[in-house]
Every structure is written in C-alpha cells, then in structure tokens.
Swiss-Prot record:
Major site of localization recorded for this protein: nucleus
Protein species of origin: Botryotinia fuckeliana (strain B05.10)
Pfam families: PUF_NOP9
Protein's job: RNA-binding nucleolar protein required for pre-rRNA processing. Involved in production of 18S rRNA and assembly of small ribosomal subunit.
Family to which this protein belongs: Belongs to the NOP9 family.
An individual GO BP term: endonucleolytic cleavage in ITS1 to separate SSU-rRNA from 5.8S rRNA and LSU-rRNA from tricistronic rRNA transcript (SSU-rRNA, 5.8S rRNA, LSU-rRNA)
Residues that span the membrane, as ranges: none
Pumilio-type repeats, residues: 118-153, 154-189, 230-270, 372-407, 408-445, 614-653
Source organism superkingdom: Eukaryota
Subcellular location: Nucleus, Nucleolus
Keyword tags: Nucleus, Repeat, Ribosome biogenesis, rRNA processing
Name of the protein this chain belongs to: Nucleolar protein 9
Feature: compositional bias, Basic and acidic residues: 1-36, 193-205
Chain positions covered by the region annotation Disordered: 1-52, 193-213
Length: 791
C-alpha cells in the first residue's frame, strides 16, 4: 500500500488530523473574509467616487428608492441582547398582560411596577427585540402618565434610530398615541392632572426612594418637543423610510390635534397589515376624546410649520415631485400638504411668493398651456400613487386655486376622466366642490357616459352626482333617466342588475340548508363573499332611495314589481339587505311621503299570497332565523312606530300583525340565537302578557337599543354553551327573570319593585286616617313612599 494511502490509527493521530483540518478551515475563512472586506471597501470607494461626481445631492438622500432604510444598519447603534432568563421572564409577563386575568386593578398595577423594575435599564433592548417588543406595547397601553414619561426619558437620544427600527418603531407609535391625551389633560384639566399625579405616586410606591428620585417633572408637551428636536435635520430621509414614515405620520397627527380614531385618520396611522397588539378585556372603544379634534398647545402648531419649512428647505422641486410617486413618501407628503392647506396662516395660492409645498408643486400659472404646473397635474392625474396627492389638493386647496385647476384641467375633460379607473377618484373630489352651475354642466358632459360607467361597474361617480344634485338642489330627472336606460327598461331586473347578482345565484345563496339525516349532520350554510361591484351597486341603490323624486321612485317601483320570494331573498343576502332597510325608512320632512310605498312593501313581506315563498314558515319567521334578516325586523319595528314621524302612525297596525305572527313560533325562536334577539328586541314577553303596556312602549320608542336599561343579566343557552351567551335586559315586564319576578318573588317594573295590593291598601287607609287626625304617622317597614304617597 502506498504511504500516502495509509491512515494512521489511534486516538492521537485522529486528534492531530482534526487540528490540521481546523487550521486549514480557519485559513480559508480568513482569506474569504479578507476578500469580502476588499470587495466592500472597493464598493464604498466606487460609491464615494460616484457621489463625488454627482452634484445633485437630493438623490443621494433618497435611499428608500433603492429598498434600504433611511438609517443604514451599520450606522445604527447596538443596544445588546437580552439573556435567556430575561427573555423567558418578559415572555411570561407578556402572556400574563395579554390575558389580563388579574384579581383586581391593584394587583395589575403591582405587577406592572415589578415588570418596570425588572426592565429598568433594558428598555431599548426590549423595544428592539422581536420577541419582547409586544410586551413594551402592552406595557404602554396599561402605563400611568408618569411611567410613560419615564419611557420618554429612557428613549431620549435614540429616537432617530428607534423610529426607523422594525420593532421599536411600533413601540414609539404606541407611546406617542397613548401620550396624546396627556398633553390635552395637562393643558385643559389641572384637576385631572393632580388626580393622575396622586395615582402615579401610588403606582410607583413600590419603587421606594428610587421612584421619587426618578419622578419626571417635565410636561408631556416638552417631551414631545424634545423628541422633535432629535428628529430635526433627518426629516427628508425619514419621509421615505419603510418604518419611520409611519411614526412620522403619527407625530404629525398628534401635533395637529386631529382625531385619532376616525377612519380617515386610521388609514394614515397604520396599514391594514399591521399586527394589532391588544389586551384581553381592555376597553378600546373609541371615546369622545379620540373621535373629536383635540386641544393642543400653540407650540405644537409652530412645530408643524417648522417641520414643513424644514422639509421644503432640505428638498428641491425635483425631489418633491419624485416623492409624489414614491409609495412610502406619498402618504407623508399628503399629510404635510393637507396640514399646510388647512392652516389659515399658510393658506396661499400656487404662485405665492412664500415658499410652500403647494407653491413648489405648482410654481407658475396653471391656466397657461404648457406651464410646469399644468404638465405636473396632467402627469399625475392617471398615476395610481400620485393621483392621491392631486385628490388632497382638490379637496383642501383655496377656492381661487381650485377654480384655476378645474377650468384648466378638468372642465373640458371631465367625461373622459370619469371613465378612467384612477382619475375617477380625483373627479369625485372635484364634484364635491362644484357650484350648481358647474355641476349641471358636468352632468351634461357625463350623462352620455353613464351606460359605459354602469357596464364597467364604476357606480361611485353616479352616486356622487346624485348626492351633489340633492345638496345643490339641482334637477335629477335627466340623470335618473340615463341610469334607467343604462340598466334596462325591465323593472323586475333593475335591482338585480344594480346589485350585480343574478336571481339564480341569489336564490342559491339564501336557500335554507337541507335537513339533517340521522347519519350526517346538517351542513352549515356559508354565504359567498360579496364582490366590490355588489357593494357599490348596493350603495348606489341606497343613495337613490334617500333622494326624493325620480331617483327614489325608480327604486321603489322596481321593488314593488318584484315577487315576495325575490324580496325575501334580497332581505337575506348580506349586501342587498341594506337596500330593503333603506326602503323602509320614512321620507324626509317637507318631501313627498312614501307611506303608500312602504305599506305595500311591508304587506308583501308579512302577508304574501299563497305559494309565493318556498319556505314552510312565514317570511317573518325566515327573517327572524337569519342574521341579515333580523336587521329587517329591527327596521320594521322602528320605522312603523317612530313617534316623531306622523307618516308612521298609520303603519302601527302592521307592527301588531308582525308581533302576532311571531307568537305561534315562540319555541322555534327561543331555540335560535337570532330568534332570541328578535324576541327580545320586540319585547314579546310584554306583548304576550300585557298588550296595552307593549303598545305604550313601542309607541314611545322605548324599545331595545333606545331605552335606558338599568341592569343587565347574562343568560346561557339551554345546552349551557358559553359561546351562545346572549345578553338579556330587564325590561318593564321583568324580561330576564322568570315570570317577571325579582328577588324574593316580587314583581319589578323598570328595575324598581312593584307595590303589592296589600301595601297600596295600607297606604290608602293610612292617608284617610291621617286626614281625619285619628292616626299617627308611622312609616311602613321596608317601604319608601314617593310622590303623592309621601306623608
């Protein structure tokens, strides 16, 4: 055997061979790392030489266009990693906070104080951790104002890096949003501020002397302004950063005092893909504070103006125009432009001497053909991203500038722009601001295109035209005729074509499931998901029903031409059920009454001719057993008994007929979840026992959803399933307690104990004796007299 093929045996030779292999691998790794460093250094030198040759510095500050963040990973500071024990502790704390299963608020406050004590000095690590950043968000949701201020102080000096971090940016957004209310409370409510200070001291009492030393005395306003000072000088790069752009929008909305919970604001704050970090049982319903405009200090308004001026100073016109079409920077630019145009002190025209965003985008007279402003607007009106900036301009621009843009760009081309899928949204913004004369001219131009718009299922334009005609008191006759011609002359098909659904599909979607066999369980009925065209068609029909005159008459005549089976199917389908609900509403005051139409429609639903429906039970019961149909019954209850509507007074007999139709099917309704809702909303227990009291209640509007319920009890289903729990209110006849009796078998009315016959007789006897002077005033035990019975 050759020597080179001989393999040494033994432990020492094996270890020696492994050491030699490891040395060879280390040498190869060193060589590869040196080559990698050389390649990186050469790339940096190439980039440096490229930037040195390029005189335009704006493009070099536009890193998001290449898919990188504003702050490079190499320049971002490293805060360290949590140890395994720390990660396990914080992970467990996150689970406990998410469950929120604490015996009391004091126990939860004590737990929060302990978590904050463990997290002291590790806040930056937790915020940047993929597994623990959710814990930081939940801590912020439950923190006191003093604890939030401490987080501000811990994050201070690192905000430019945190807002551009993948995980820490969400923590910053939550901290800013949850701290917005504290600014307003410190500004307007000194008493609340003192109360919160006392609560903060109690919450931090566990920290001892250290908590007193670390107490933050600065106002939340100053902490926000200090955060803005850190971000100053980097706004142009943050605008296009993948993560920081969202945080910057949050800051701008908080500084402007805009509502935080409105749908238009929420779309700016976060995307639909954002993970919703919540806490079980925590009340997150929108409050009056979050739905209305907030009071903010003047320093915040000055800060917005400074941000806009710094943004303009750091970017030239070419960069801002590129930003218009940038998917990340466009929403920030929209918000900055809206804040500038809605600020009274900076509301200037496009060719203003003051350098603003609008004057940068539209530097010259747009009415001149071939001007830079005209070229810019014509270039973005068809752009999927840039058209959103044009929507903002047409919505918030001053009247003089709006008229210039309308006459130069839209007036002669409005029909062609309305046909385009993207430009039509800009046209909608334009139509919302047109005068009556301009609106009538626009209708004349668009009317020949109605048939094409209907064929493409773009009914948004048609809906807006009808609504603006009602607002401007313009004639809708010609527009309604064009709509009727576009959908065809057959009234039986108008609603179905408008809702973009065939009769066969509608019947199959709303057909009852087949009965269950002994071997196979009953299949669960799954309704198909409505398409966008069905949704837009339903909205168009609802808008036409709200406009008295030809639009409403067109839909009403089409509904009356339908058989009962089709009306029932429309009532059961999730999208078209809203059309039936809108048709049941009374007509507005000072408009032609729709009483006759509503009476015919309701009669066709509750009293169909024999064989009109395929279901064995009456249509009212079919509606009661459907989640969509229950809304129809609620509309029938409120629209036939509304006390403020004189036209509904004569329809009350129909309401009684519906209640009579529900009575024989009480067991079937009580076995169904939706049936129990209908039985409760219609106060059927009161109808069954005391008809006169039921009539008074429904005529006064004191039905479910309108009455002031004093207490609630939760009832489980007959099988005890906790998932089938239905809330049941204590109504006037004692609904929610067996046989209308309260504790101790005493009847209750409106949440109060009803006096028995013997007690009433005693009162009468005592009053007579007192009047004759033969009886002393002795209060009855356990009885508190009120009103005329007080002695």
């Amino acid at each position: 055997m050759p020597k080179e093929n001989k393999h040494a045996r033994g432990r020492r030779d094996t270890l020696k061979r492994k050491r030699e292999e490891n040395l060879d691998r280390e040498e190869d790794h060193d060589n590869d790392s040196q080559d990698l460093k050389k390649r990186r250094s050469s790339q940096i030198e190439d980039e440096a030489s490229f930037r040195a040759l390029d005189n335009d510095q704006t493009l070099s500050s536009f890193p998001a266009a290449t898919g990188t963040n504003a702050i490079e990973v190499a320049d971002r500071p490293y805060y360290g990693l949590l140890e395994d024990e720390e990660q396990e502790y914080f992970r467990r704390a996150d689970e406990l906070l998410e469950l929120n299963d604490f015996p009391s608020d004091e126990e939860r406050s004590l737990f929060l104080a302990n978590v904050y004590r463990e997290a002291k000095g590790k806040e930056l690590k937790i915020a940047c951790s993929q597994s623990c950043s959710r814990l930081m968000e939940r801590l912020i949701l439950l923190s006191t104002p003093q604890q939030k201020k401490k987080l501000f102080s811990q994050f201070a000096g690192n905000f430019p890096h945190l807002v551009s971090h993948r995980f820490a940016s969400h923590c910053c957004e939550t901290l800013f949003i949850q701290s917005a209310s504290i600014v307003t409370e410190e500004l307007t409510g000194e008493e609340k501020k003192e109360e919160k200070k006392v609560a903060d001291v109690k919450a931090d009492a566990e920290d001892g002397e250290e908590g007193k030393e670390d107490e933050i005395t600065e106002s939340m306003e100053s902490l926000f302004l200090a955060t803005l000072d850190e971000l100053e000088g980097q706004l142009s790069s943050l605008l296009t950063d993948r993560f920081a752009s969202h945080t910057l929008r949050v800051l701008l909305i908080i500084l402007s005092g805009r509502p935080l919970e409105k749908s238009s604001t929420k779309s700016l704050l976060q995307s639909k893909k954002k993970e919703k970090v919540g806490i079980n049982g925590l009340d997150t319903a929108p409050t009056e504070f979050s739905l209305n405009k907030r009071t903010v200090p003047e320093s915040f308004l000055w800060a917005i103006e400074k941000i806009i001026s710094d943004t303009i100073a750091s970017m030239d016109r070419a960069f801002i125009q590129v930003l218009v079409g940038h998917p990340t920077g466009n929403p920030c630019l929209q918000l900055l432009l809206e804040l500038e145009l809605t600020n009274p002190s900076s509301k200037k025209g496009g060719n203003s001497e003051q350098k603003t965003l609008i004057s940068t985008l539209l530097p010259d007279d747009i009415t001149v053909e071939g001007s830079q402003s005209a070229i810019f607007v014509n270039g973005i009106v068809y752009d999927q991203i840039g058209s959103r900036v044009l929507e903002t301009i047409m919505t918030h621009s001053p009247g003089k500038l709006f008229k210039q843009i309308y006459r130069a760009i839209f007036k002669d081309r409005i029909a062609g722009l309305a046909r385009n899928e993207i430009a039509s949204y800009v046209v909608i913004r334009v139509l919302n601001r047109l005068s009556k004369e301009d609106l009538e001219e626009a209708i004349t131009e668009i009317s020949p295109q109605i048939e094409g718009l209907v064929g493409r299922q773009r009914t948004n334009i048609i809906k807006v035209l009808l609504e603006r005609c009602q607002v401007r008191r313009a004639s809708t006759e010609a527009l309604t005729k064009s709509i009727a011609d576009a959908y065809g002359s057959d009234k039986n098909e108008l609603i179905l074509k408008m809702a973009d659904i065939s009769l066969e599909t509608l019947t199959l979607a709303t057909a009852p499931p087949p009965a269950a066999d002994d071997d196979k369980p009953a299949p669960v009925a799954v309704l198909p998901k409505p398409s966008p065209s069905q949704l837009h068609g339903s909205l168009l029909a609802q808008a036409m029903l709200k406009i008295p005159g030809p639009p409403a008459q067109l839909i009403q005549s089409s509904l009356l031409a339908l058989p009962t089976s089709t009306i029932l199917a429309l009532s059961l389908y999730p999208t078209t059920t809203h059309i039936i609900q809108a048709s049941l509403l009374p007509s507005p005051p000072n408009t032609p009454s729709n009483l006759l139409f509503r009476r015919k429609l309701i009669n066709s639903i509750i009293s169909p001719p024999a064989g009109a429906t395929s279901t064995p039970q009456p249509p009212i019961i079919t509606l009661s057993l459907s989640s969509a149909g229950t809304h129809i019954l609620d509309s029938l209850l409120h629209t036939t008994t509304t006390p403020t509507s004189t036209s509904s007074a004569s329809l009350f007999s129909l309401c009684e007929r519906i209640a009579m139709s529900l009575m024989p099917y009480e067991p079937l309704l009580r076995d169904s979840w939706t049936g129990r809702i209908v039985w409760r909303n219609w106060s059927m227990d009161l109808f069954k026992r005391r008809r006169a009291d039921w009539v008074k209640r429904v005529k006064s509007g004191d039905t479910q959803g309108k009455s002031n319920i004093q207490s609630q009890v939760v009832l489980k289903s007959q099988d005890g399933n906790a998932n089938a729990v239905v809330g049941k209110e204590i109504l006037g006849d004692g609904i929610g307690k067996p046989h209308g009796k309260g504790k101790g078998g005493e009847k209750e009315i409106g949440g109060e104990r009803q006096k028995s016959a013997i007690e009433l007789a005693r009162e009468k006897f005592a009053a007579q004796k007192l009047a004759s002077g033969k009886l002393k005033t002795i209060p009855l035990k356990g009885f508190k007299a009120t009103g005329a019975n007080a002695i």
